[in-house]
Amino acid sequence: MVDLVYGRGITDLIREFPFYLTFFRNIIDIKLFHKKRTLYGSADIINVCNLHCSHCYWWLNREDENNELSAEDWRTIVRNTFKKQRLIGVTLVGGEPTMRPDVIDVFCQEMPGRVCVVTNGTFPLKRFENLYFYWVSLDGTEKVHDSIRGEGSYQKTRDTIMEYISGPSRKGKPAWKDIWITMTINSLNYRTVTDLADEWKDKINKIGFQFHTPFVTGDPLWLPFGETRNEVVDCIISLKKKYPNYI
């Protein structure tokens, strides 16, 4: 199968044509007529996580663990909200979303090929037939990642990824295409951007970078605007030129 757009083949693009048509109409409305349009969605599907990462905002807003929706409740929400607006895609977050495979399955059934799941990768990754991809969080190389997410967490995530990509293809595409890595850059790990990108090159599909957003005044993980941050941006731009289909 030929990949034309981020892992999508010709049959995928034909099937999803109505969504792309709506997407470009919304872009025109936004750019030309300054209308408010929804292009992409996100859903917190679980209020539980097995890690306590030092940079994560979720712990500040944590609610009752028992106050969660059933899979069929989520199906109703998907049909009445996400699908009605013809969103181009949806990202599932938490907590740790892979602890609710029943909900992930509902989203994949209702929005085939348009669902990505953000995960810490410490649990085995299920092969959902209609999943778009997994966003696996790695916050730098092993030592700094473990200082943020807990001792041994990097190796657990690495083992999970390697186990998944050693598995069978899905819809004619090799398993490694399902794995994208995301790194949240902060004051502890910014020096490891290049090393992490090089380490995972030719193992997974893509890697993306974002800067840590401070959620309290004086957040020590915040990388302030200035020379150092600019150097990190320049580094990412250089990596993009070096690995245009990977970064």
How would you describe each model-predicted region?
Residues 1-4, 12, 64, 132-139, ...:
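Radical SAM enzyme [4Fe-4S]-AdoMet core and its adjacent flexible, acidic
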Residues 2-127:
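Conserved alpha-helical substructure of the radical SAM core
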